[in-house]
Amino acid sequence: MEQQKTILIIDDDLALQTVLEIALREAGYEVILANDGQEGIEKLTTTSPDLVISDIMMPQMDGVETFQQIKEQLQDNGIPIFIMTALNRKPWFADLEAEGAVIIQKPFDIDQLLRLVNDMLM
């Protein structure tokens, strides 16, 4: 039997965090929650997620800095990182994508996100 995949969600929006948690758990994933970038980085020291979903606009440490630190900490071991944003497409999104991030535009369809997660982890 295949081991359950783990997803780390980093987001300061508790409502969105809850929606994502419920949808991902119902899809069969284990979910770990962090309320900001710093907490997300700390969770990486005690867990080994198969995928990270992070918001871009957060207090203290934004999603871009969080992404950079995750990449540094995981030493580019291939864990997919999704970055959610309500911002219109910015030129620097291409830099994040070149480094391996998947940009998810808000609002998004939860079923589409689940398909993307499933495709990435299968």
Named regions from a protein language model:
Residues 33-51:
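Acidic, metal-coordinating helix/loop segments flanking the phosphotransfer/catalytic sites
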Residues 65, 79, 87-105, 111, ...:
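Alpha4 helix (beta4-alpha4-beta5 surface) of REC/receiver domains from two-component response regulators
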Residues 18-26:
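Charged docking surfaces used in two-component/phosphorelay signaling
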Residues 1-6, 111-122:
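Non-catalytic signal-transmission and effector/linker regions of two-component phosphorelay proteins
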Residues 36-39, 62-68:
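Acidic catalytic/metal-coordinating carboxylates
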Residues 55:
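Active-site residues of response regulator receiver
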Residues 58:
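Receiver (REC) domain active-site loop signature in two-component systems and cognate sites
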